[in-house]
Amino acid sequence: MNNKYYADAYGPDTKALAACIKKAFEIANTDDEVARVVFYSYTKNNFMQVSKFLGDDNVNQMFSRPMKFRECKKPIKCATAITYKKECEYRDTPKDVIVCCHMDSKDVFKVDDYRTAKYVIALSWTLDGLNAWKARWKAENVLDGRMEEKADAPKNALLLTALQEMDVRMYETKNLSHFDDAETCKTYIRCIHKYLPDVKPSDITDYLVTELGWENKNAAEVGELLQRLREGRSFRGGQKTHLKEYYSRWKEKAVNCAG
């Protein structure tokens, strides 16, 4: 089941916003597990277009208390990035339809990490602002119903093998908070940098999130490590010798899997 939707917009595109609102209400009215619809953006100043549809006074009230409208069976709330993040510290059940208003991929990726989000509908402010997000998730366009071409999972079998092995050796903690896990991750990134020169940081981030279940913020840290090396910078930690042994093992595993 697809749970990611988008509309590309340039500036205050009321048609695109209307399509997002329609989709949000449609989902809320048909999915019994949905508890509410949340309009979400950076600050309260970013809800002017939403106010044109729901009313200024209503939007101001919905920051503190959800409201119901005839068109939607579930309560509707407005939330800024800061207030919604605080709410999510105490809630972890996916029951929200979140409409991200006038945002780009970088900030919508953060919403993906919230366990409260069952559906995400993203509306951009620039026409290419959501390219990375919609490609990662093969999001559906609410304006025409077409599916975005999904970002290909890295076709390099060695990279897939490396990331899967790395995840296991990190005991599937899926973050770098523990020293030993961080060291393991850095070793793998050093090896990928040395022996897989065609791999991009986004290849790593997308695969960790969509296939191995990492949170975006943690996967992005791993991608950033490779980015640093690609740019000629460095970082502390991780094994720097005997990396060819890792690479040789990946090749052997990849051949066995292919056979």
Where are these predicted regions, by residue range?
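A short acidic (Asp/Glu
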Residues: 15-22, 45-54, 108-111, 131-135
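A short beta-strand-to-loop transition that corresponds to the Sensor-1 phosphate-sensing loop
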Residues: 83-85, 103, 123-127
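ASCE P-loop NTPase helicase motor core
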Residues: 107-172
